[in-house]
Amino acid sequence: MTSSALVPSTASEGDRIAEVARNTAETRIRVRVNLDGTGNARLSSGIGFFDHMLDQIARHGLIDLDIECEGDLHIDGHHTVEDVGITLGQAFARAVGDKKGIRRYGHAYVPLDEALSRVVVDFSGRPGLHMDVKFTAGSIGQLDTQLVYEFFQGFVNHAGVTLHIDNLKGFNAHHQCETIFKAFARALRAALARDPRSAGVIPSTKGSL
């Protein structure tokens, strides 16, 4: 059985803060996000390198991020990584709200030594993940690199975004992964920025997203 609960927030009106809890037979997760934060993070997924990547989202996206997860790591990391992506996506969707005044689109290129990645995001309301990454190793620390796709798929499906991720160069898997998450964070930061010239306006000619 799966349950996701929106935890009541004490934030004042206008704050882009949300907290979501997700409990299943495989994981117990609580996520809290502040989209207008300073990059503070408290992370506990049980997978060290995954926490390191989540920290990149907070630091480079200037998003305050609090994630607690107890997962069935005695099996493997799949449920933990995927379900954190799902819950984080739900929290983002709630925190973003009606999307009035946001820039909607964001992109970033991020290098790390020989590695270079590009991420483009659209808060379109239409979930879609388009990811072209060929990791040069099957695992980084305790993180199975196949699960990076599962994390982003979970996020995309529940945040309602279109996301393009391309690793353009790189032969060190750690560097590949880190550039992906840093570029993702900076693309989010750009897309979620408020444009004072379109305050109160939904960024679509349809009038809704």
UniProtKB/Swiss-Prot annotation:
Gene Ontology, cellular component aspect: cytoplasm
GO MF annotations, alphabetized: imidazoleglycerol-phosphate dehydratase activity
Q: Which GO terms describe its biological process?
A: L-histidine biosynthetic process
Q: Where in the cell is it found?
A: Cytoplasm
Write down the chemical reaction(s) this protein catalyses: D-erythro-1-(imidazol-4-yl)glycerol 3-phosphate = 3-(imidazol-4-yl)-2-oxopropyl phosphate + H2O
- The lineage's top-level taxon is Bacteria
Q: Which InterPro entries match?
A: IGPD_sf (IPR038494), ImidazoleglycerolP_deHydtase (IPR000807), ImidazoleglycerP_deHydtase_CS (IPR020565), Ribosomal_Su5_D2-typ_SF (IPR020568)
Q: In which pathway does it act?
A: Amino-acid biosynthesis; L-histidine biosynthesis; L-histidine from 5-phospho-alpha-D-ribose 1-diphosphate: step 6/9
What main location does UniProt list? cytoplasm
Which UniProt keywords are given for this protein, alphabetically ordered?
Amino-acid biosynthesis, Cytoplasm, Histidine biosynthesis, Lyase
EC number annotated for this UniProt entry: 4.2.1.19
Q: Which PANTHER family is this protein grouped with?
A: IMIDAZOLEGLYCEROL-PHOSPHATE DEHYDRATASE (PTHR23133:SF2), IMIDAZOLEGLYCEROL-PHOSPHATE DEHYDRATASE HIS7 (PTHR23133)
Q: Per the similarity annotation, which family is this?
A: Belongs to the imidazoleglycerol-phosphate dehydratase family.
HAMAP family in alphabetical order? HisB
Descriptive protein name: Imidazoleglycerol-phosphate dehydratase
